Regions:
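Fe-S ferredoxin-like electron-transfer domains
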Residues: 2-177, 181-185, 194
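Catalytic alpha/large subunits of respiratory electron-transfer oxidoreductases
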Residues: 48, 96, 103, 108, ...
Length: 269
């Protein structure tokens, strides 16, 4: 609710209201809460009650806002709108058109970040849906970011779909190992030790808010059953397990035994 001067307070859309001198903003007035409840009622009118099986449950903006505002009933007596539940957008993303709230974040992402428009809002009115041009599959190496951007469970990763509940994931800040850029990421591990997903972590100096799909899905080798869990140091013709410290000491000894190094090669450079 915005009040300026002697004019009565009015409810304004925050993202379209410019600040001005003498403006008083009250986000907790009864009028503000009532307006938010009305907006939520409109969004929930056709939104399916999929929370128990939705991958976004636990990190869903719409779910959080509904709990905050206490809106648990609706006045509409009409049936819910139905649309395609499992619409494949290519190798990475699945679209649930019933859950979509038409915020158009995904549309704007492709237009503004990779600069290649691929999604659009097609049809009109209550039949509006997100779709690709001519129903073509999405392309490019940044598709996974739209699953992070989606405020509901409309856009989900095929690789993470039905794999874990988010409240069972232990989250740890890390750095993507896939290339020399070193994007800041969040590693999410299921209780028990299996890595379930990598997600971008905000770092304006490196990757901003995004990460490429190559890095996003670069964790299969971490869960590989034949993955090396310890350093190996050669002793004669055999390799013996050693601690990380002993392994680094062996590498240091090999480097010290030769002339000064001109460069160090790495598959990640």
């Amino acid at each position: 609710e915005v009040q300026q001067g002697q004019t009565p307070g009015r409810v304004m859309v925050a993202c379209r209201t410019y600040p001005a001198e003498g403006m008083v903003v009250n986000t907790e007035s009864e009028k503000s809460h009532a307006t938010r409840r009305e907006c939520l009622e409109f969004l929930l009118k056709n939104h399916p009650l999929d929370c128990p099986i939705c991958d976004k449950a636990g990190e869903c903006d719409l779910q959080d806002y509904t709990y905050q505002e206490g809106q648990s009933t609706g006045r509409s007596k009409e049936g819910r709108r139905h649309a395609e539940k499992r619409h494949s957008l290519g190798d990475v993303i699945v679209l649930d058109q019933e859950r979509c709230v038409l915020c158009s974040r995904c549309v704007r992402f492709f237009e503004e970040v990779p600069k290649k428009a691929q999604l659009t809002v097609s049809n009109l009115g209550s039949r509006s849906v997100i779709s690709t041009f001519a129903d073509r599959p999405l392309t490019g190496n940044y598709q996974g970011n739209i699953a992070d951007l989606c405020p509901v469970g409309a856009l989900t990763l095929k690789k993470f779909r039905f794999q874990a509940r988010v409240w069972n994931l232990v989250k740890q800040a890390s750095t993507c190992p896939e290339c020399s850029r070193g994007c800041s990421i969040q590693v999410e591990v299921l209780r028990g030790g299996e890595v379930k997903r990598f997600r971008p972590r905000e770092n304006k100096a490196v990757n901003g808010w995004w990460m490429c799909d190559t890095g996003r899905f670069a964790f299969d080798h971490v869960n590989a059953p034949n993955r090396l869990a310890n350093a190996l140091v050669r002793s004669g013709h055999a390799l013996a397990e050693a601690s990380i410290e002993d392994g680094l000491a062996a590498v240091r000894a090999l480097l010290d035994a030769h002339a000064d190094a001109l460069f160090v090669a790495s598959p990640f450079c």
